[in-house]
């Protein structure tokens, strides 16, 4: 297992208030024509949100083969619903998981 440390970066237009659930996932995105596969997940609960805030996290990721490509995904929900809806915050581009755990990962999200 590897442990990654990171920060979720909220945008200037992020809502204030509490997020009931923040889900940080690592997904296997190796296959272009297939759904990604969940490899690791960490959840944070009852976290204060504010514009430009940075939210610290840690996630443990199992070792994978060199043929696998992993990517981070973040979903912030104010009401703990797993379905993405208007007002949630998400990563919207690919953030590859580095092979080295030393750098702190920064994951910007946008309001949807």
Positions of PLM-derived features:
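A short, amphipathic beta-strand motif
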Residues: 4-11
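Short, ordered, surface-exposed loop/turn motifs in non-cytosolic proteins
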Residues: 15-24, 32-33
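Local beta-strand/beta-hairpin segments that build beta-sheet-rich folds
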Residues: 34-41, 86-90
């Amino acid at each position: 297992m590897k442990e990654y440390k990171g920060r979720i970066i909220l945008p200037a237009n992020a809502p204030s208030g509490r997020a009931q659930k923040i889900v940080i996932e690592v997904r296997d995105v190796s296959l272009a024509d297939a759904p990604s596969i969940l490899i690791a997940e960490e959840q944070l609960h009852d976290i204060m949100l504010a514009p430009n805030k940075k939210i610290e996290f840690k996630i443990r990721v199992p070792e994978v083969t060199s043929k696998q490509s992993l990517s981070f995904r973040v979903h912030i929900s104010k009401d703990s619903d797993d379905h993405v809806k208007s007002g949630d915050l998400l990563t919207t581009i690919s953030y590859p998981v580095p092979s080295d755990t030393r750098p702190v990962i920064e994951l910007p999200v946008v309001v949807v």
